[in-house]
UniProtKB/Swiss-Prot annotation:
This is Protein PrgJ. Required for invasion of epithelial cells. One of its GO terms (biological process) is protein transport. Keywords: Protein transport, Transport, Virulence. It comes from Salmonella typhimurium (strain LT2 / SGSC1412 / ATCC 700720). InterPro entries: T3SS_SctI-like (IPR047754). Signal peptide: none annotated. The keyword Transport applies. It comes from the Bacteria. To S.flexneri MxiI. The gene is prgJ.
Length: 101
């Protein structure tokens, strides 16, 4: 680690103060849900487009190393979408249970 990469202490404290002031803001559950959903939707769309572009490129499909990378990306995408689906289903089930009681 070089000396140039060490951050001055007052810069870190200034960032911590900024973080604390943001934590006191009141955010509704609906807003948090919308922010999480929109961020997830954008990330998923970008990942899907990246995978589609890789599959449509003939140079990447014929190279075994690139094909393995594409397969790994598809696997990661599949796992992520499955996880989001499961968490959404569980969340909806929990809310329905709370509303019934």
């Amino acid at each position: 680690m070089s000396i140039a990469t060490i951050v001055p202490e007052n810069a870190v404290i200034g960032q911590a103060v900024n973080i604390r002031s943001m934590e006191t803001d009141i955010v509704s559950l609906d807003d948090r849900l919308l922010q999480a959903f929109s961020g997830s939707a954008i990330a998923t769309a970008v990942d899907k487009q990246t995978i589609t572009n890789r599959i449509e490129d003939p140079n990447l499909v014929t190279d075994p190393k690139e094909l393995a990378i594409s397969q790994e990306m598809i696997s990661d995408y599949n796992l992520y979408v499955s996880m989001v689906s499961t968490l959404t289903r569980k969340g909806v089930g929990a809310v329905e249970t709370l509303l019934r009681s």
